A protein has these predicted regions:
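N-terminal targeting sequences that direct proteins away from the cytosol to non-cytosolic compartments
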Residues: 2, 6-73, 146-170
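Conserved polar/disulfide-associated segments of primarily extracytoplasmic proteins
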Residues: 65-152
Length: 170
């Protein structure tokens, strides 16, 4: 009886561990059409790689990336009229994906695996921003960064829609 109980306990622990490591999924198809219609899909492309599209709300306009002082420079920037909320997209060449993620985590950022529209990604929660890293290959990542990290309740929902929209162009 003790062996049976021990086996049952071991199975419960294994199942619990497997469930705890389940990767969250975000899907554009789960976003209501009326929300999707309140913005537009933008795209970013890199040579020899698939085109990635992402949603930008109608209240944000494109900003010339060369006017943004950031190192590295972003590939695309969108901002509200008052400049309070921004979406920046960076195309980053990295030594390796694992080294890049290790460095981010070592800098105190919280990383979590997430699947977005079938793409294995990594969410990043930093002091000043929330973002998503989309690995294009082992040495190129797209980093979607939303600032500020903490805004009003609407901004939190908008960030969720932006991140849920990231997908390979059809």
């Amino acid at each position: 009886m003790k062996k049976l109980f021990a086996l049952a306990l071991a199975l419960c622990l294994l199942c619990g561990a497997a469930l705890a490591e389940e990767t969250p999924e975000l899907n554009w198809s789960n976003i209501p059409e009326e929300v999707q219609a309140n913005g537009a899909l933008q795209q970013i492309a890199a040579p020899d790689l698939p085109v990635i599209v992402y949603w930008v709300p109608a209240n944000m306009t494109a900003v010339d990336p060369s006017t943004v002082q950031a190192d590295p420079a972003p590939a695309a920037v969108f901002m509200t009229e008052d400049g309070q909320y921004t979406i920046s997209v960076f195309a980053l060449n990295v030594t390796s994906l694992q080294e890049y993620l290790t460095a981010l985590e070592g800098a105190g950022n919280k990383l979590n695996n997430v699947t977005i529209n079938g793409i294995d990604c990594v969410s990043v929660e930093a002091d000043a921003y929330e973002g998503v890293i989309v690995p294009m290959n082992d040495t190129l990542v797209l980093s979607f960064v939303c600032t500020p990290k903490d805004g009003d309740e609407d901004w939190d929902q908008v960030k969720g829609v932006i991140f849920s929209s990231i997908q390979v162009a059809q």
